[in-house]
Curated annotation (Swiss-Prot):
Pfam families: Peptidase_C54. Signal peptide: none annotated. The APEAR motif (ATG8-PE association region) plays a key role in ATG4 recruitment to autophagosomal membranes and ATG8 deconjugation. The LIR (LC3-interacting region act cooperatively) and APEAR motifs for the interaction with ATG8. This is Cysteine protease ATG4. Keywords: Autophagy, Cytoplasm, Disulfide bond, Hydrolase, Isopeptide bond, Mitochondrion, Nucleus, Phosphoprotein, Protease, Protein transport, Thiol protease, Transport, Ubl conjugation pathway. The modification Phosphoserine is found at residues 307, 488. GO terms for molecular function: cysteine-type endopeptidase activity; protein-phosphatidylethanolamide deconjugating activity. It catalyses: [protein]-C-terminal L-amino acid-glycyl-phosphatidylethanolamide + H2O = [protein]-C-terminal L-amino acid-glycine + a 1,2-diacyl-sn-glycero-3-phosphoethanolamine. Present with 3300 molecules/cell in log phase SD medium.
Length: 494
């Protein structure tokens, strides 16, 4: 036995040393001596001397095993770099995860089955089969499909915590848990809770055609949050402004809210896609700027079909909670189960470019301050007003129809434009005053790819739900065939 332990220790040392010394030397060096940022709060990295003295105490605080032997000396540096203040702030953030055995959600007739191989692998198969036998047409867990909803709940939950308890709120015992129990219980997994998984699913079905058991994307999640906020004004958020396809915010829409009440609390939900297959490196500084803002309530996103909740960063790594850790549905200890000091780190290169950004504005003065902060952002754009004739609303997670007042004509008019269903159409002639494609940054969306830059839509089926509207979709990728030009009504009048 002793011989086996010795061999195991040697093997572990080799693996760790290989990763530390033979891997890339640039990223670890860049991570040294950097502050930790948590939703606008700054925590200096603790120096080695004070870190060594408090390492054991912090390990116990985090509920981790303490050892003064081999493993402690090997991994102690990373643990000791966390200050107690930083860990307490992390633990005080609200974190929602997968749940099991909650109040059943009925399966849609044309939706996925509650029983899947993925579910059997990731849970206790006996319990899963028992639940399926008891409720064969219901979902008792969101494992495998609810992670984006959970990170959306985390984003909304932290916004409500800041709104009701302040950014300096910390979990430090039963009294503090009692203070936040009111709004955290709004997220319990019951149909009665206004922000429960059940109500997210209902809103997703109505607004985004998402069936129970289907994975939500950032756009569907944003729409659900907005709808649930409007349906529950008692939450304290006066308005929720959503952009599902860009980081654009329109001043006239925001100022209209403040005209009614200068102290209005507004939640911005910005669905953005910061690259093609990976986040473009040019956005790093702007992402850090968003998480450094005192108005930030986090970012939901992460990896394809595997969402994470990002609440901060340190050096080149972004700090996140992982919702893919199942917990049983509980009522008595629900608030306590929504806190953890365990978090992960992710490099920008590992992140999926589709994400949902949350910003909480508390009054007109806060709005004016935040506008100055994002003036140089490469992600968020504060514009005077929305263009009336081309009001686009398209999602990143699915192809959705969008409407435009200037195109509300009978579908038969397509023939007059000289286009057919399925054609890629260059709309530059119709909307010459829209963003000039020649001015598009070569690193924005297209990265280093040299391509034909045109404003295009894809002509849809004219025999759809509303025959009085010309259905079209915004196409944000390269096309495989030439676009079809159309005559400009403006040119004809001239």
């Amino acid at each position: 036995m002793q011989r086996w332990l010795q061999l195991w220790k040697m093997d572990l040392v080799q693996k760790v040393s290989h990763g530390v010394f033979e891997g890339s030397s640039e990223e670890p060096a860049a991570l040294m001596n950097h502050d930790y940022i948590v939703l606008g709060e700054v925590y200096p990295e603790r120096d080695e001397e004070s870190g060594a003295e408090q390492c054991e105490q912090d390990c116990r605080y985090r509920g981790e095993a303490v050892s003064d032997g081999f493993l402690s000396s090997l991994f102690g540096r990373e643990i000791s770099s966390y200050t107690k203040e930083f860990l307490l702030d992390v633990q005080s953030r609200v974190n929602f995860t997968y749940r099991t055995r909650f109040v059943p959600i009925a399966r849609a007739p044309d939706g996925p089955s509650p029983l899947s191989l993925n579910l059997l692998v990731r849970t206790n198969p006996i319990s899963t089969i028992e639940d399926y036998i008891a409720n064969p047409d219901c979902f008792n867990t969101d494992i495998g499909w609810g992670c984006m909803i959970r990170t959306g709940q985390s984003l909304l939950g932290n916004a409500l915590q800041i709104l009701h308890l302040g950014r300096d709120f910390r979990v430090n015992g039963n009294e503090s848990l009692e203070r936040e129990s009111k709004f955290v219980n709004w997220f319990n997994d019951t149909p009665e809770a206004p922000f429960s998984l059940h109500n997210f699913v209902s809103a997703g079905t109505e607004l985004s055609d998402k069936r129970p058991g289907e994975w939500f994307g950032p756009a569907a999640t944003a729409r659900s949050i907005q709808s649930l906020i409007y349906g529950f004004p008692e939450c304290g958020i006066d308005d929720c402004i959503v952009s599902v396809s860009s980081g654009d915010i329109y001043e006239n829409e925001v100022e209209k809210v403040f005209a009614e009440n200068p102290n209005s609390r507004i939640l911005f939900l910005l669905g953005v896609k910061l690259g093609i297959n990976a986040v473009n490196e040019s956005y790093r500084e702007s992402i850090c700027g968003i998480l450094s803002s005192t108005q930030s309530v986090g970012i939901a996103g992460g990896r394809p079909s595997s969402s994470l909740y990002f609440f901060g960063y340190q050096g080149n790594e972004f700090l996140h909670f992982d919702p893919h850790i199942p917990q049983p549905a509980v009522e008595d200890s629900f608030v306590e189960s929504c806190h953890t000091s365990k978090f992960g780190k992710l490099q920008l290169s590992e992140m999926d470019p589709s994400m949902l950004i949350g910003i909480l504005i508390k009054g007109e003065k806060d709005w004016q301050q935040w506008k100055l902060e994002v003036a140089e952002s490469a992600i968020i754009n504060v514009l005077a007003k929305r263009m009336d004739d081309f009001d686009v609303s398209c999602s990143m997670d699915d192809v959705e129809s969008v409407s435009s007042n200037s195109m509300k004509k009978d579908a038969s008019n397509n023939e007059n434009l000289g286009v057919l269903e399925g054609d890629y159409v260059d709309i530059g002639a119709i909307f010459p005053h829209t963003t000039n494609t020649e001015d598009v940054d070569e690193y924005d969306c297209f990265q280093d790819i040299h391509c034909k830059k045109q404003k295009i839509v894809v002509m849809g089926n004219t025999h759809t739900v509303n025959a009085n509207l010309t259905d079209y979709e915004v196409e944000g990728v390269l096309v495989e065939k030439e676009t079809v030009g159309i005559h400009s009504p403006i040119d004809e009048k001239c």
